[in-house]
């Protein structure tokens, strides 16, 4: 049997394997060094040398996701060359591949543009800049957690401020990248730890200790996988998940290899037939589930007719449900495997010591506030505002990385509401469930030679219960075993007592090993997951549900109003339901935020719309009870702070109110408490002297209601909320480095 890929990405189907070399990062280092002549330096090279070097670098670029002789769509959109398809494009590709190969040769160093100039002719200077900038700002080079990157990270942010909601892989990747771009960043995380759905549980004590993955576990394919790069930077060994995966029937007997092979062959043939059927059905296939089509074809072609074969067939169905974190009755027959062409090649690996080592390295040094579940996200042309409990956080932009399950539950209120197109995509996509029972035992009773083994179940409805076991003893530091629960069984798992679940899984293990004379002891410690009822996830990972398609992943990735951005595994059409997909989405959004910030900076003189969080009614209500009223001047401030530097508003009424109440002109401006006190302390009692101080001495400019809403909408929102008695405190993204000025993003 082929081993499943991971609890996040088991193979979408069981394929016949093609023999190929495993991708070895260290071997690739040696190859690059050999081809490039060691450290970068100018040296005489023959035409044959250059051709061989170019070919080698093209293969390296191919291994990390670049086409050998074409541009990526992102490169075309970025305008890296003036004309497509000509000599300039070919030259650009050679330069691009060279830069990629140089950095992949040593991912622990920050590759400088000047280093590229040492090995590329000055005739291609414009291509060096185009390729280097594209690769740098799109997260293809100089990304990750290398300690040697520190000198190249700006100490103070100058590009703007960003709030990142969620400290999972997507949020951490984006935050680190944004800091390297020069942004001020603040990460808000609802849990007490980083990682999100990547969670390494430390089990046991002094004598028996193990690190077990309760969430995402396997690095699925090293080719082009950024998590493999992080492991290299941290010098963490990777353990290849071995292919051997024996299956045991419900009586604990090893399944006959011939029968196993025959059923697997029939299963794969049916999946091939599904592809043929949906092509014939065209649009009608969008309305039918994969489970419905598979069962119809199984009966039609007489696959798995007897009870023993049916149990084997059900095991493969459970494995498919595991791969998609969803019941086959929910998966789209038309698009369930739409990401197959983008699967990363190479070995599937465990990370020695657990994935927490990657998570901790990514989180190190980031400004993260834990225990901050977000209630409301407000966004508009003036900036963004995040409400978490009794606190308000403000910034220029916000990146939301919460799981799709949280978005489906409407746990976060968006003001204004998300576009209907995006909300519809959220509703259409599926978000399924995978649960686990993690057990630490006194010894490795299952043997050292296995990383996985499977178990058949008696009934189809229960096919996903403890159907697969992962052995972590090779990488966890102790004799740990994890049982997986998929499909309908994963849903029932949520409401079953842990003691009952443990009894069932031990019964299954003792049924396998007892007849062999192997004693299965009680575990030292057991943990049962509950991802479906976790209010910070409401499930495990996404899939394409009936009525949905890969386009919905793209819609989820769309930004809103150049202020609100989205990342996470459910926002990547090519790599959904994977750890590396989440990480790559964070890099993608960091790049997008940088481009938008540059665009906004270059268009500051263009008129902007009013900050969406407040309106004229809010403004008028505030001045019904001003903090200070002096003649025609009224002042309002945030009651939660007495800081002289804190900002408020002043309203000046120009009217003939006594004669005609409708004849009133009201103008506004923003000022500090300190400035208001100067006006208040004037000896003269006339309105004219105070107005002169306001405009001439202090140099403040009066404006109409619409203009002050445009300019100070975020400030007005903060003051209004505080004056309503909501007792919220105000924090600006990157507060340690930012002035406490709510208008810093204007």
Swiss-Prot record:
Keyword Transcription regulation listed: yes
Broad class of enzyme this protein falls into: oxidoreductase
Keywords, in A-Z order: Chromatin regulator, FAD, Flavoprotein, Oxidoreductase, Repressor, Transcription, Transcription regulation
Residue ranges occupied by any SWIRM domain in the UniProt entry: 51-152
Region (Disordered) residue spans: 1-26
Taxonomy, superkingdom: Eukaryota
Positions that bind FAD: 189, 191, 197, 569
Keyword Transcription regulation attached: yes
GO BP: chromatin organization
InterPro entries in the cross-refs: Amino_oxidase, FAD/NAD-bd_sf, Flavin_monoamine_oxidase, Homeodomain-like_sf, SWIRM, WH-like_DNA-bd_sf
Organs and tissues of expression: Expressed in the shoot and root apical regions of young seedlings. Expressed in inflorescences.
Annotated signal sequence range: none
GO molecular-function term, one example from the UniProt record: oxidoreductase activity
Family, per entry: Belongs to the flavin monoamine oxidase family.
PANTHER family linked to this entry: FLAVIN MONOAMINE OXIDASE, LYSINE-SPECIFIC HISTONE DEMETHYLASE 1 HOMOLOG 2
Function: Probable histone demethylase that reduces the levels of histone H3 'Lys-4' methylation in chromatin of the floral repressor FLOWERING LOCUS C (FLC) and the sporophytically silenced floral repressor FWA. Seems to act in partial redundancy with FLOWERING LOCUS D (FLD) to repress FLC expression. Required for cytosine methylation of FWA. Controls primary seed dormancy by regulating DOG1 and abscisic acid signaling-related genes.
Name of the protein in question: Lysine-specific histone demethylase 1 homolog 2
